[in-house]
Amino acid sequence: LDDRRSEALIENFAGQWLTLRNVSAVQPDEDVFPDFGERLRQAFRRETELLFDSVLREERSTLDLLAADYTFVNERLARHYGIPNIRGSHFRRVQLEDSVRGGLLGHGSILTVTSYANRTSPVLRGKWILENILGTPPPPPPPDVPELETAESGTPLSMREAMEQHRANPVCASCHRLMDPPGLSLENFDAIGRWRDRSETKAVIDASGVLPD
């Protein structure tokens, strides 16, 4: 790891395993997320690479990948996360004291590549966790999966209600019972990784859940 070529190892391994390569391709809806731009995109990727680099070079526990009480930010990323008193474009390690973030699942990179352009996706996020963290990828979805439905009143369902409808379908239930709980646990993060208390439909977010045995 002292060899400079190890930087390519970190970049490529993290890019493949964590799907960081997809950060360059995501295009959040400009009307919904007007603050998203190239500087933030680059900062997302760099934060995750630096955490991975830190765990390897400093021989830290691999548990830090999921529960680190620190991260790496520059001014642009710190502003996005609401971390005060960070100035300049260079990245530095900061402690996350009493923070809602911690580890990869609080990184804007992961939260953005597992979202749609205009909203979050508990299914994509849950699938990412099953595949990349737990090593238990779900089978492919059945064909002609229906879109998220609305309530009889015509108003959008909350994300949790929509997921419950999917689980009510026996064809969908076996996979969604595994994917939905970890995905819904990240619903307080919007489609570009900002913390929020209400969803796109203005409903109060319930991010509770229990993983099945």
Where would I find each of the regions flagged by the language model?
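A cross-family structural signal marking well-folded subdomains
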Residues: 1-128, 139
